[in-house]
Amino acid sequence: MHPTRTKLLAAAALLAALAAPAGAADVTLLNVSYDPTRELYEQVNSAFAAQWKASRGQGLTVKQSHGGSGKQARAVLDGLEADVVTLALAYDVDAVAKGGLVKPDWQKRLPDNASPYTSTIVFLVRKGNPKGIKDWNDLVRPGVQVITPNPKTSGGARWNYLAAWAYAHQAFKGDEAKVKGFIKALFANVPVLDSGARGSTTTFVERGIGDVLLAWENEAFLAVDRLGKGELEIVVPKLSILAEPPVAVVDSVVDRRGTRAVAEAYLEFLYTEQGQEIAARNHYRPRNAKVAARYASAFPKVQLVTVDGAFGGWQQAQKTHFADGGLFDQLYTPGR
């Protein structure tokens, strides 16, 4: 992200904070997010609420809702009153926009297509890596159990699937029959499809099911730091995908509730140096160059494809792979 844009956002957030009368009544926001962002937004909410209180004299409570990204988008469309959505992929925010709740230009309102941090997909294995898993090709071996959520409900699962497809496309030099065979074999090794990424982490870590978990990079680090107790290891594949989780104000809700100023400032805070520092501490890759340099050693180098470059964008990827009757439905056989 360009440093001048960062300074402008910080100034805009401060001006928004100073614009309202001091001592205004306390305000509440609802952030509807995807599955593994709980810890990130607990820290963001605390820091932003303190800043908002100091600058405006107004108390702020940010409530959180978490689940599979697709399910969360549908919940907002069905009436869950989110002031902001912080979802796993642009397609899910576009779905909310198509429902008339978010304006179509939402990606142009904030830098980096309204994606303040990035992540990627890595493997989480058990201590000592007993199955010797090093790259995607190891996931289709007989006897290897792979844990991943359901791409029909989970944004992380869609990133997992597309990363696997991108690997196979490169490995098989674009031979679509072989790519499909690879994906079919991979999902034949999946014993259970949870609805969201955190559910899959629970299945792998707490229930002890599976040999390898396909995980958001931040979720894998969190599992090792706080859940694994020295019993888990991260394996970084040679190729993965650049995951760009987006954020947006839900226009219809903030205009009805009168929370637009605080909701916009909340999302702008994610781009400030403080917000980027919080993201990096929670193992999300920051956009801010200065913060990224400080945390460079924390993030492994990996070849990353993009959804736009490899799949023609999220609209095309969704239609081809994840829509009813799409390639995922064709290649996945439940209960195998």
Give the role of each language-model region.
Residues 25-154, 332-336:
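N-terminal segment of the mature folded domain
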Residues 128-134, 153, 166-174, 253-261:
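Short helix-loop capping/hinge motifs at secondary-structure junctions, enriched
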